A protein has these predicted regions:
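Short, small/acidic-rich helices and loops at N termini and domain boundaries
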Residues: 1-61, 229, 302, 328-340
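Glycine-biased, small-residue-rich flexible motifs in mid-sequence functional cores and linkers
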Residues: 49-50, 57-340
């Protein structure tokens, strides 16, 4: 899809042209050229229309940029509700499905404060910490995204139907799974990578040593995102997972300021840009000027800069360093860059 803007063009493309695409094996080309089973595709489109759902593909400009930058972003997302540009300022909150009073209180406080600071809260609509985070965010007037481990038409757990509806009206519910997919256990690790991928960082509130929320934290690390954890009672099983993360280097969180400090470079970045005059721009090297112009609209991940500049990665890194040393560009957590 990086070469063909329209999926239909992929199927009508010449065999030899498809072979020129990096990573496309002859067997894959053969499958593409021989594909004629369009009936299931038509059925899926009809389901989308009937359920009034949106399908967002990887090449769509509206595809979430945080998620786009992970190693294996889902090629498409089923969505009910709306994802906005401001949702790139997001923190995921995950944890135990059976939290204690302390876990509930902390989650409510942090989620509400994030919402009041214009941060979107991402979670998985599960029982416990997930649901508490979604509700606290909504109550504070914020936006929240829920990622499902099932088809988007399958609300799980069933008692969250009203919460599902409220989220879709004040954020979005999304899934990479086909309509009708049941919430199988094997789906949830895939869901977790999306939760962390949508976010600048992941906060683990309470988790046992084998909690699925630790998988989300692992994905966050792999995706070069921040990992935060709420410290807990050393004698409680619910604290062992989060305390272990802190021991390994996760940011200890006492209040929302600990999170905002780490992602501060992403907040209000548009108002902090350094605008160069014509003389200063002309004084830049050609590659520096190109990178400056690419970064003129918003912060971008290093992979995006390399792709958009069409320059070798070593050249991009060298020129970014030069711009950074001259105070023109700043680096943010997760290998993002923006105009200072």
């Amino acid at each position: 899809m990086s070469r063909y803007s329209d999926p239909q063009k992929v199927f009508s493309a010449d065999y030899k042209d498809l072979l020129k695409i990096e990573g496309i094996h002859p067997n894959i080309v053969k499958l593409i050229k021989e594909f004629d089973d369009w009936e299931p595709v038509k059925e899926e489109v009809e389901k989308l229309k009937k359920l009034k759902l949106d399908l967002l593909v990887l090449t769509d400009p509206a595809y979430p940029k945080n998620l786009y930058n992970i190693y294996n972003p889902p090629p498409y997302l089923y969505i009910t509700g709306k994802i906005t540009k401001d949702d790139k300022r997001a923190i995921s909150i995950v944890g135990s499905r059976i939290p204690d009073v302390y876990g509930k209180k902390v989650t409510e406080q942090i989620a509400a404060e994030l919402a009041r600071n214009g941060i979107t809260v991402v979670s998985g609509l599960a029982r416990g910490i997930d649901s508490i985070a979604h509700r606290a965010c909504l109550k504070a007037g914020g936006r929240t995204l829920a990622v499902l481990g099932s088809g988007i038409d399958f609300v799980y757990p069933p008692e969250n139907k009203s919460l599902y509806k409220e989220i879709s009206q004040n954020g979005a519910v999304l899934s990479e799974f086909k309509i009708g997919t049941k919430p199988e256990a094997s789906n949830f690790p895939r869901r977790n990578r999306i939760i962390s991928g949508l976010s600048l960082g992941t906060l683990v509130v309470q988790a046992t040593e084998k909690s699925g929320s630790l998988i989300t934290a692992e994905f966050a690390l792999e995706q070069n995102r921040e990992v935060f954890a709420i410290p807990g009672n050393i004698g409680s099983k619910l604290s062992k997972g989060a305390n272990k993360l802190i021991k390994k280097g996760a940011k200890l969180v006492n209040d929302v300021d600990d999170i905002l400090e780490e992602i501060g470079g992403f907040i209000g970045a548009k108002n902090k840009k350094k605008v160069l005059n014509t003389v200063q721009i002309e004084g830049l090297e050609p590659a520096e000027r190109l990178i400056y112009e690419i970064l003129s609209n918003e912060q971008l991940h290093i992979d995006q800069i390399i792709k958009m500049s069409n320059l070798d990665s070593s050249i991009v890194l060298a020129n970014l360093l030069s711009l950074e040393l001259n105070g023109i560009v700043s680096q943010l957590p997760g290998k993002y860059f923006l105009i200072s």
